[in-house]
Amino acid sequence: MSWICKTLLVCLSFNPVMDYTNNDEFIDNVRACALHLNSMHAESDRVPINLIVAQAIHESNWGKSRFAVEGNNLLGIRTFDPADEQLKPLNNPDVSWGLRIFETKCESISYYIDLLNHNHHYYKFRSERITQHFSDEIDLEKLAMTLAIYAEDIYYTQKIIRTINELEAYDRD
């Protein structure tokens, strides 16, 4: 079964309505979806929950961005295929890409997990993750550093790491 079919089946079998009115609820909703989706993957192919949450926070402004609200896109996932449903940036509607529209917010998380697991741009992420898996060491900072290519912001990975650290401190409270 292709990863696209698997993604669709997972989304069809688990389609929570992400209902949040504050940042804590946003975190809880993203975590619930990510936990379920990760359970559908081998342990070595899972994406750490706090990494997903941190990127969703930054890419969607806590689920409040236009792309999150109108397109259910929590992770800033772009498409260059004009056949895909997409939203263009309001300040630059003539760009050759758009942000992909998803049926649900959870579907955008599923797509993100599969993107990291299969897209050639994220081979460094997969390499670091498998190294950590076999050494029983989980270092989210090292994993986050492999995702510099994910965004145009040169400080992106530092922002993600800071947010991961804040989430981990929040979890300890």
Predicted feature residues:
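Catalytic cores of secreted/periplasmic lytic hydrolases that degrade extracellular macromolecules
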Residues: M1, C5-V53, H58-D173
